């Protein structure tokens, strides 16, 4: 009721019961990574449904203030622009927008490096595993910088509890296990080294043993550009 939305509906003897396991999943994510909301100023990027979910979690966990950031801020609602957000004094940033989501990776609308005092940056986006926002937060030395994959898994586990009408005693362990397995499948292995050091040979062996697709970037560049690598270097240099 506080969020105004459900994502899990269970039929119990003809009556429909609605639950929001996104709330539970986000709460699990924050607890698992030591995000402390008590007395903190929280900055939430975005104004959609996930904003309401994360805002409810932050408030329930004792946040002193929850601020909303929008590309088109409604000043009557007290919303901030991204430029204003930098000087908000927030300790916690939560991204609920699709900024940085695959295939538009590399997008980051907030300059976290210019925000001293940040304790945590949480991004609900789970593909890629680390968005540009999370990468920049890590580079800036923010103590906690985490993406949304574990939230996705947690909300699914909690939804399964409602559907099956039973609690999983080992739910936290199972959430960690599934998250780790998904992360292994999601992440690529990149081999970097000098010419003729064996990257292609080792890459093909790894791909075969792990059941993954092998991609040679030199071959992909030649396909796209229509020139050989030596010809490209000769014409444009190696930088």
Give each language-model segment a name.
Residues 20-23, 30, 35, 39-59, ...:
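Glycine-rich adenosine-cofactor-binding loop
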């Amino acid at each position: 009721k506080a969020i105004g939305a459900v994502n899990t509906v269970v039929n119990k003897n003809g009556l429909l019961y609605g639950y929001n396991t996104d709330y539970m999943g986000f709460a699990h994510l924050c607890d698992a990574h030591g995000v402390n909301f008590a007395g903190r100023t929280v900055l939430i990027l975005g104004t959609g449904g996930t904003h309401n979910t994360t805002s409810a979690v932050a408030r329930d966990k004792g946040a002193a203030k929850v601020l909303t950031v929008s590309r088109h801020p409604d000043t009557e609602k007290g919303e901030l622009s991204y430029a204003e957000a930098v000087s908000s004094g927030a300790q916690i940033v939560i991204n609920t927008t699709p900024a940085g989501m695959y295939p538009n990776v590399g997008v980051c609308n907030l300059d976290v490096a210019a925000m001293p005092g940040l304790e945590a940056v949480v991004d609900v986006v789970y593909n890629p595993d680390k968005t540009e926002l999370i990468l920049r937060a890590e580079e800036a030395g923010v103590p906690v910088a985490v993406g949304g994959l574990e939230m996705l898994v947690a909300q699914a586990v909690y939804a399964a509890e409602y559907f099956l009408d039973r609690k999983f005693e080992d739910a936290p362990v199972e959430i960690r296990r599934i998250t780790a397995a998904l992360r292994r499948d999601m992440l690529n292995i990149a081999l970097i080294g000098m010419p003729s050091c064996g990257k292609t040979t080792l890459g093909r062996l790894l791909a075969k043993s792990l059941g993954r697709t092998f991609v040679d970037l030199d071959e992909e560049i030649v396909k796209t550009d229509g020139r050989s690598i030596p010809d490209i270097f000769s014409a444009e240099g190696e930088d």
